[in-house]
Amino acid sequence: MFATTLQGFTLGLAMIIPIGAQNAFVLSRGIHRNHHLLTATLCCLCDLVLIGIGVFGGANLLAASPIGLALLTWGGVLFLGWFGIRSLRSAWRGQGAKLADSPQLMGVKSVLAMTLGVTLLNPHVYLDTLMLLGSFGSQFAEELRSAFAAVAMLASLVWFYSLAFGAVVLSPWLARSRQGYSKLLILLLVSPCWGWRCNWRAGLCWRHKAIFVPHLIKINPGFMR
């Protein structure tokens, strides 16, 4: 039981931690103290539902559909490419502008819409929750499967609320930091986590020989949320 829960928690964190569109949005809401708890809560709820679906049968259904798998994989490639280009353009045009100079405050409806957008329109979320966490957890017996799903969900709760509250605590420092240096710092911080998650996926492929994992690693070895 302990080994299963440890695997569920660490694998859950490994899937979530690398900074991508979803995490970056949670971070930005925390920095600006703009409905950050609402953003974190909505991200957690989406993860809880998707992890549950994946662990209790959704992963097997998706793995049996080559077309669906291909759409998710290439959708993830395109989404990651778009997000990377958008971030680079934003950093280039900012040219040292301070975060405090553009508060980017949003209303509740806008925050809800953006959070759902960067979550449910992000193919990496489905790859992480439905495919990878789901396929790993579905191999356990029923009682262990429930424990795995629970601690994977707990990892999501811990991460998103830590990210939101951490951004609030660090917001005075981050607000004084220039955009270029802030983004470089974020990149340096998340690079080890990115590699950690790639190793987890390679381990899943080697140990459990899931037919879809080698395909994902070959096409795009570092998905970011």
Curated annotation (Swiss-Prot):
Coiled coil: none annotated. One of its GO terms (molecular function) is amino acid transmembrane transporter activity. The chain crosses the membrane at residues 1-21, 37-57, 65-85, 116-136, 150-170. One of its GO terms (cellular component) is plasma membrane. Keywords: Amino-acid transport, Cell membrane, Membrane, Transmembrane, Transmembrane helix, Transport. It is a multi-pass membrane protein. Belongs to the LysE/ArgO transporter (TC 2.A.75) family. This is Putative amino-acid transporter YggA.
